[in-house]
From Swiss-Prot:
Belongs to the FapR family. One of its GO terms (molecular function) is DNA-binding transcription factor activity. Transcriptional factor involved in regulation of membrane lipid biosynthesis by repressing genes involved in fatty acid and phospholipid metabolism. Gene3D superfamilies: Hotdog Thioesterase, Winged helix-like DNA-binding domain superfamily/Winged helix DNA-binding domain. Keywords: DNA-binding, Fatty acid biosynthesis, Fatty acid metabolism, Lipid biosynthesis, Lipid metabolism, Repressor, Transcription, Transcription regulation. This is Transcription factor FapR. InterPro entries: HotDog_dom_sf (IPR029069), Transcription_factor_FapR (IPR017275), WH-like_DNA-bd_sf (IPR036388). It comes from Listeria welshimeri serovar 6b (strain ATCC 35897 / DSM 20650 / CCUG 15529 / CIP 8149 / NCTC 11857 / SLCC 5334 / V8). One of its GO terms (biological process) is negative regulation of fatty acid biosynthetic process.
């Protein structure tokens, strides 16, 4: 692995983050052969925000106007991709405030909230409410893990006011939650 001068590393770091704003400090440290702390110091010197803030910025710029059914800041997790009436993806980092103190396992309502708010966000109407949800928790999620929720809208049925949204949440490639959300939707008058 090539060793870069501080100036070269910082220039390449800036380019790497511009190309992929979702890259983690750990991935950058590995890429440049330095410590995570060095990457963090470089980011601070370059006024580049941490991953969480970069994700929020990308989501607010790209999706704030797209999501009609609820304000973007009410979505649990950060939306990283959305195609209204089709699909959506969000990420949620499990931190200490989301887990049971004794065993560091995430409280189920956080996983449910991420999936439910994503199912709501993918509906293109101003009013979208969950009428029924069937959720299966496949495995526990631990503090420090990242949950990636993927919502997929099923083709329309006879009842146009109800849309079914399937949500699957993963940690890495491992399924942790599977849900079916029946969403009532209408344009507010």
């Amino acid at each position: 692995m090539k060793k870069y001068s501080k100036k070269d590393r910082q220039m390449k770091l800036q380019v790497a983050i511009e190309e992929n704003p979702f890259i983690t400090d750990e991935q950058l440290a590995e890429k440049f052969g330095v410590s995570v702390q060095t990457i963090r110091l470089d980011r601070v010197a370059l006024s580049i925000p941490e991953l969480r803030e970069r994700i929020k910025h990308v989501a607010s710029v790209n999706y704030a106007d797209a999501v009609k059914s609820l304000p973007i800041d009410e979505v649990i997790g950060e939306i990283i991709d959305i195609q209204l009436s089709k699909s959506a993806i969000s990420i949620f980092d499990v931190r200490s405030e989301h887990v049971f103190k004794r065993n560091k396992i995430a409280r189920g309502h956080h996983l449910f909230a991420q999936a439910n708010s994503l199912a709501t966000a993918v509906i293109p109407n101003e009013l979208a409410l969950t009428t029924q949800a069937t959720v299966r928790f496949v495995r526990s999620v631990n503090e420090g893990e990242r949950i990636i929720a993927k919502a997929k809208v099923r083709p329309a049925t006879d009842n146009r006011a109800i849309t079914i949204v399937d949500v699957k949440s993963y940690v890495g490639d491992e399924l942790v939650l599977k849900g079916k959300f029946e969403m009532y939707h209408a344009t507010q008058k």
